[in-house]
Structure formats: C-alpha cells, structure tokens
Amino acid sequence: MDVNPTLLFLKVPAQNAISTTFPYTGDPPYSHGTGTGYTMDTVNRTHQYSEKGKWTTNTETGAPQLNPIDGPLPEDNEPSGYAQTDCVLEAMAFLEESHPGIFENSCLETMEVVQQTRVDKLTQGRQTYDWTLKRNQPAATALANTIEVFRSNGLTANESGRLIDFLKDVMESMDKGEMEIITHFQRKRRVRDNMTKKMVTQRTIGKKKQRLNKRSYLIRALTLNTMTKDAERGKLKRRAIATPGMQIRGFVYFVETLARSICEKLEQSGLPVGGNEKKAKLANVVRKMMTNSQDTELSFTITGDNTKWNENQNPRMFLAMITYITRNQPEWFRNVLSIAPIMFSNKMARLGKGYMFESKSMKLRTQIPAEMLASIDLKYFNESTRKKIEKIRPLLIDGTASLSPGMMMGMFNMLSTVLGVSILNLGQKRYTKTTYWWDGLQSSDDFALIVNAPNHEGIEAGVDRFYRTCKLVGINMTKKKSYINRTGTCEFTSFFYRYGFVANFSMELPSFGVSGINESADMSIGVTVIKNNMMDNDLGPATAQMALQLFIKDYRYPYRCHRGDTQIQTRRSFELKKLWEQTRSKAGLLVSDGGPNPYNIRNLHIPEAGLKWELMDEDYQGRLCNPLNPFVSHKEIESVNNAVVMPAHGPAKSMEYDAVATTHSWIPKRNRSILNTSQRGILEDEQMYQKCCNLFEKFFPSSSYRRPVGISSMVEAMVSRARIDARIDFESGRIKKEEFAEIMKICSTIEELGRQK
C-alpha cells in the first residue's frame, strides 16, 4: 500500500515538523592533516579586523603587537575590533545600576573560591599545551611536568597546595633570568628484526636538560597551541581552536569563575545554564516582551549572528571590564584577576605541525615544521598559502605568531557574555529615552534580540541603535545572516521557539546507538538516552517503545548476543545456546548473555542487573557479580558513571548513567603500539602515578588526593598510618601477634630504604 507522506502531518502543528528537516545523521566530518593553514587564517583575519590600531613592540619578547582599542569609530558596516573603553565602562556602570550589588556580590563569591581552590583543579580538562615538550598532553601530565620544572628551578610548587600558590610560582617564574627544563628527544636507528629479517626503524626516547633564557620562557608561557576543530557540521571550511598552557589556565579559571557568578544573576544570560533551564530563561524574556506589547506596540525578534565574535573581542577590553567590576576590592584580588587578560594581550599562537610536502614522482614526503615558515623560499607553496605566509611573517617568532588582538575560540565565554548582556541591558526605556526599547538573550556569541516599538519605523530605529551600540564595544552583528520575525518565532543556541519551545528530537538521533566498548555501559547508556529524551524532547510513549525495541536489536548485533532460542547463527551462538539450555530461570539471563529484553518504558531507570536479580539462577548470580572472577580485568565502578554523547549540533554532552559492577563491565586494554612510541615514557609516568594514588587511597580511604604529594611525605604518611591501623587491629584481636610483628618489620624496612635513598 502506498502511503501519502503528507497524511503523517495532518494532525501535527507545522512547527513540530522541524525534526524532519534536520539532515544530521551519520558521522560528522573530521579534520585530517595539519591545522597550520587554519591558524594562519585566524591570525591574519584577526589583525585585519584591527588593522587601523597602533603597532607596538613587546619589550620582553620582541613580539610586534597591534592595539585596536579606542581606534577609529566605524564608518561602514565592515566588522571591526575597535572597542571604545569609555563605552564599555559605561555599559558596565549601567549594568550595575540596573542590578544593584551584582559585581560586589560576585566578587565576594569569587574571592572565597580563589582562597579554597586547590591546584588539582587544573588536572580537569582535556588536552593541554605542555610548554616543556611543546605539544599537547593530558591536563594532569602537563601540570605534573610544569610543577616538576618549577620545583627543580627553586620554586615552592606543590601538587596539593592551593591554586593561588601555584599562580604565585607562575608569576615568579616569569621574573627568572633562566629556566631549566627537561625535554624528550627521539633517536631513530635502522635495525634488522630478528623474526622477520626485515629492516625496521627503532625509536628510543631520551630525556635531556635544556636551559631557556627569559625571552624563550616567556614566549612558551604565553603560547596557545592550536588544533583544528573536529566534527563541525554544516561548514565547508574547518577552523582552528586553541588550547592554553598551564601558566595561563589557572588565571583564566578565576576570571571565568567571577564572570560565571555574574552571568548566574543576569536574566538575559544563556550561560552557565543549559537544557531546560536555559529554555525557561528564554521563554521568560519572550513572555515579558509579548505581554508588554499586547495592544499598542509591535514586537519583533532578531535571531542574531555575529561576525567572528572572538576575533573582534579584545583582551584589553576585558581588562577594563575586570578593573571596573573589582574596583572596590582588595589589591591582591584585583591583581590575580587582571593577569589573565594581560597574558592574553601578549599571547602567541603556535602554528601547529607545519606543512607536509610530497613528491609523487620520487615517492618522497617531507615535513616543513612551522619554525621554518619564517625563512623558507615561498616558491614551493601554492598561491593562497603563499599569501598567508607573506602576511604572517612579520609576526613570527620561533614558530609562533604574535597575536595580541582577538580572543581565540572558547576562551572567555562567560566574560564575553557579560559584555553582550550589558548591551542588551541598555535597551530599557529609561536608557533609550524614546518610544522603542529592547531586551534579549546572550550566550557566548549567540544572541536573540527582541525589539518593541509603536510602529515599524520605531522597530527599525531600535535595531539600528542596537547595532551601532554593539559596534562601539567590538561586537559586529552580521546583517546578512541575522533575520527578523514577529516575536514568538526565533532560534537561540539551536533551540527553536514558536509560541513555546519546539522539541527538536532529530538533534539527539546521533546519540542513539551502541558504541561497542562495554556491554554493561552500552546497555545502561542506551536506555538512559531514551529516558532522557522522554523527559526533555517530547519523545512520546509509542515512539519511545519503538526506539527501545530498535535499540535492543542494535545491541544484540555488535555483541552477537541474540536470544538463546534464536535461529541466528553467530560466533557466540553455540556458547549462548548451551548457557540458555542449562539455565533454569531463562528470564534472569542478561541480554548480553542471550537473555530476553526486560525493558519497557516504565522501568528504564533501573539497571538491567537490578531488574533481573531476583530472576537469576544462584550460580549465575555468583558468576556475574563476582569481583574475584579471574577472567575479567575488573573495574571498580562508582554507582554513577559519565558517558559522552554526541548530539547532532553543539558540543558533546556528558550524561550520567547507572553503573552496576558485573563481569560485563570491563576496561579495554591499552593499545600495545603506544609502547613503541615517544609516548612510552609518559605512559610509564602515568602508570606510576596511578599505582601511587591507588596505594595511597587504600591507606586513606577518604582521601581527596588525586596525585602524590612529594614522595617522602607520602611514604611517611602511609607508614605511620599502617602502624596505627595495625596496632588497633592487633589490640581488638582482628590480627594475630605474628601478623602484627610482620607489619611492623615491613614498616621499618621501608623507612630504612627511604633513609638510604
């Protein structure tokens, strides 16, 4: 029977059909090769937006710097970064006037955070630029390396101290005449493989000491490493993102803490909230504007787009904002917060890996590292690359480009939101002093603007005034990409509003699926995704039931765990059939062991092992939940785990799911090939940390330490703890006299070894 597809929509309001218009299934595009070109684009574009600024030279590093602040007032609609300090300060003052005490209170909250934050806060986060090795590392490793270098250079660095003390070390390190660092180097040699008798390249890694003079150290400390942003949909060209080193991170963290605290108190801010809370905020603003405009006024909404938001922002402007926000605060606090923007005004962008050349005829490939771009003959490059390199050359120092203006992607999201909101705040009638007024929402670079006025001319005048006010602080609304509708229809941060929010369920489609890493986690994540979408995205009961059945079907294929009584033949079916036949209570088998599906939409919140526990055969229970089962490298699991799910649009989201420790929750073993690479030394360090931490936590179960605290003190702490515990256990009769004596002997031996060392 042919179905006329339009019939499907007869009962559906038009706006609910948005899910059918989203093409985001399948894998998003990833970038390959080098990001050098994209980074040069960013640097060149940023300078172009500020080209009429003043050039100066940094006295410490010799880097040429462009300062567009208080530059020419705009005469056309071209995007520009010439923010006017007095305008920014005035916007801040008005923001404070309409929210009495907001800055004061946020400063007090932040001051408390500054005094309490420990340095291990910096171990959170993903890849970080490790300035000692000049490449990205996991955050914890990069921090450890930084602290190790600080300590060997006579600074008091301590992994368990306060973050503020670490930042004092950072400041001191910048005053030092030279810094000695430990870097890795590779030796390659050709050797004959005994097994295959072929020639292979063997790499060995050595560590060597290297001295950096003040200039070289400062350049490294101020460097942001760049990469290509992956998995961006809907774009033809890739773009560069930056990751700062450990010197900058701590300062940025405190500035963002202050800005976050301010954003939480602003009704127009789309950050730091997300999801349903964000929708409620937006709905409130829309409701307010519509209620006020019922009879006499017109109300229009602009779904806005800004041109290169962060390339037109300026760290010097952020410094002015912070100076104003903290003006009545103690000197030390103002200093701590002003360092991040100062470092950003002097930042350097690392150009990445450089270019790869290959000659098809000679089968040769060669890498031109970024350091060589300053001197290499340009005849080897195509025209567009040649232009880029010519333009960037005056800015190059040691393979990094001086980049004073602009903010790089994703650095001061909260603080730039405060700036955006301060312009929205100026739309109140008491400030516009005319018949039109505006309000709206700002979330980083995304905004929605609602303008009310008695007639169309008023609306136009309002939009125009908003546009020009934005220009004065370095915000450039893209006229071509912003569109205006009657209030009630708009889009903000990929939420579509039409008389209320339209659930765009297709955005979540990519996160439905089975990743094939771990049977226990996959089952739990799968049902949690369905549960969450029923709560948040209007996933109706019938569709959810269908999604669930499809999910179970999907789940059985990668793990080859079709029901024990199925006819489907797979590699596992022989074993699973045998298990099925010898199990008395077949309903108790997990799906991954060929059991039936226990789920329906009523019990999605219960982990599968819990649902089936009462139904299981006793010996199956014993095998399934046995931490001593030797065939599984067993993972201790907290009751809640975090999974990363990828919606179609926007950043990867972290999602909590229940984790029950069964023999089906395993950790994949590390890929062996890493052991032959330059990463091997780092891997060994990491494993060493891991072992120390695990040991330490056995002694101090409530331990909040995540990393060793200077070797001697840690060992001493564990030894003394062992002695105390042993004495208590001996006196209460839990251990025998011989065991007690043995423990004491071991403790003395450890101390003796420590002394000999």
Swiss-Prot record:
Q: Per the UniProt record, which EC number(s) apply here?
A: 2.7.7.48
UniProt motif (Nuclear localization signal) ranges: 187-195, 203-216
Keywords (A to Z) from UniProt: Eukaryotic host gene expression shutoff by virus, Eukaryotic host transcription shutoff by virus, Host cytoplasm, Host gene expression shutoff by virus, Host nucleus, Host-virus interaction, Inhibition of host RNA polymerase II by virus, Nucleotide-binding, Nucleotidyltransferase, Phosphoprotein, RNA-directed RNA polymerase, Transferase, Viral RNA replication, Viral transcription
Bias category Polar residues: which stretches?
Answer: 55-64
Which subcellular locations apply to this protein? Host nucleus; Host cytoplasm
What segment(s) does the record annotate as region Promoter-binding site? 249-256
The record ties this protein, via InterPro entries, to:
RNA-dir_pol_NSvirus, RNA_pol_PB1_influenza
Top-level EC class as recorded in UniProt: transferase
Entry's Gene Ontology cellular component terms: host cell cytoplasm; host cell nucleus
Briefly state the modifications made to the protein after translation.
Phosphorylated by host PRKCA.
Q: What's a Pfam family this protein contains? A: Flu_PB1
Start and end residues of each RdRp catalytic domain: 286-483
Renumbered to this chain, region (Disordered) spans 50-82
Key word Nucleotidyltransferase present: yes
> Which molecular function term from Gene Ontology is one that the record holds?
RNA binding
The record lists its disulfide bonds as none
The UniProt entry lists the main location of this chain as host cell
Q: Signal sequence: where?
A: none
Reaction catalysed by this enzyme: RNA(n) + a ribonucleoside 5'-triphosphate = RNA(n+1) + diphosphate
UniProt keyword NADP present: no
Function description: RNA-dependent RNA polymerase which is responsible for replication and transcription of virus RNA segments. The transcription of viral mRNAs occurs by a unique mechanism called cap-snatching. 5' methylated caps of cellular mRNAs are cleaved after 10-13 nucleotides by PA. In turn, these short capped RNAs are used as primers by PB1 for transcription of viral mRNAs. During virus replication, PB1 initiates RNA synthesis and copy vRNA into complementary RNA (cRNA) which in turn serves as a template for the production of more vRNAs.
- Which family does the similarity line name? Belongs to the influenza viruses polymerase PB1 family.
Tell me what this protein is called: RNA-directed RNA polymerase catalytic subunit
Instruction: Please tell me the species this chain comes from.
Output: Influenza A virus (strain A/Goose/Guangdong/1/1996 H5N1 genotype Gs/Gd)
Gene it is expressed from: PB1
